[in-house]
């Protein structure tokens, strides 16, 4: 049962072939058996989960069910969830039990979905490898020596290991697409503003966006139907008509124009990754798509621009963690300032401190124009690049990362090398566009490789259509690690 997709589980629950309690129990048993070696889940509460499952079964029996009622999921540990610890992978919030729920969590609860637990993540979503968690690194289910990708590494590893059929996640610079690629699962980051950020603990507010990680594009579409929607409590939430993201899944790809950015296939791209992407493009051509070369000339500027803008926003967002009202507080201090200093020194990890320092520096008097303002201008140029590209094509294809997953510890001593692994994902966030990762093969060492699909604003249904048709023609998404 734990190998089934979201769609299959939904059908089995509706047909009364399995109950939500039975389903939740099977997944909880699997988490208990496999999570000690993966470290993908940081919090489990069997009683709460089974209570939610019983409520879902009551809805199913009463005929009051929705499409995903009774289906279990895990939430990335930065979505506030009432009564559950919401740690953000940080010592700072290790003791924080949320008094309210995020909009995404509310939407999932309203749909009747059942929470299995909370997924591990890079601290405050800062990282590309999920080695920055206070609770320890997450292991890649395909190779326990490999990173799962970050920052939503726990979400991706949980879905890949079939500890859950679907997981919520967030993407600020690639944090859904990177781990989905490295763990051989499907993930989509929607257009900025499609999913409410209310109750989603902020890293960089102009870049953060929630989305699902699941086994298939169809599952992602079903989950996005639950997660998306206007929320007045988030000032960046977009007021748009409700949309069915699964509506175009079965459309033909005949006449589809696929853009291949020449900058994405330059030096630094691993041969295994290039081969997987080339094979995926060939597969789409067989389905009727046409490939055109495009240019995104400011791609290489996305790294310096992102690593100015994101830390700047993080430094202001994380200034609220001072030990006064909630979270970690230092035990011994002389006065208020001493308490602030010791609390933050003890509560934050190295990568978070590094980004706070950079962010504070670029926002300081005398440097704001030289760095922050310049980065925002580059951001506009990057958005313009995409605007021009989408006049020539319907979707853009390329790699998610330059290589398959690297080893745990391999890049942790060199932050710049770690940042370079985000080269193909950052510009999508800077432009506010939707992007997704679809399993597209394996490297010679057996580690998964993802294909990145980038769409124009609000083109999620079209991207999911491309991904679904690709998955109908291939079986990369159906392969599971042997644990």
UniProtKB/Swiss-Prot annotation:
EC number of the protein: 6.3.5.7
GO annotation, cellular component aspect: glutamyl-tRNA(Gln) amidotransferase complex
Pfam families, per database record: Amidase
Active-site residues from the entry: 76, 151, 175
UniProt key word Nucleotide-binding: yes
EC category name: ligase
Catalytic reactions of this protein: L-glutamyl-tRNA(Gln) + L-glutamine + ATP + H2O = L-glutaminyl-tRNA(Gln) + L-glutamate + ADP + phosphate + H(+)
InterPro entries in the cross-refs: Amidase, Amidase_CS, Amidase_dom, AS_sf, GatA
Taxonomic superkingdom: Bacteria
BP GO annotations: translation
SUPFAM superfamilies: Amidase signature (AS) enzymes
UniProt entry keywords in alphabetical sequence: ATP-binding, Ligase, Nucleotide-binding, Protein biosynthesis
Subunit structure: Heterotrimer of A, B and C subunits.
HAMAP family: GatA
PANTHER family, alphabetized: GLUTAMYL-TRNA(GLN) AMIDOTRANSFERASE SUBUNIT A, TRANSAMIDASE
Protein family (similarity comment): Belongs to the amidase family. GatA subfamily.
Name the UniProt record assigns to this protein: Glutamyl-tRNA(Gln) amidotransferase subunit A
Species, as recorded: Chromobacterium violaceum (strain ATCC 12472 / DSM 30191 / JCM 1249 / CCUG 213 / NBRC 12614 / NCIMB 9131 / NCTC 9757 / MK)
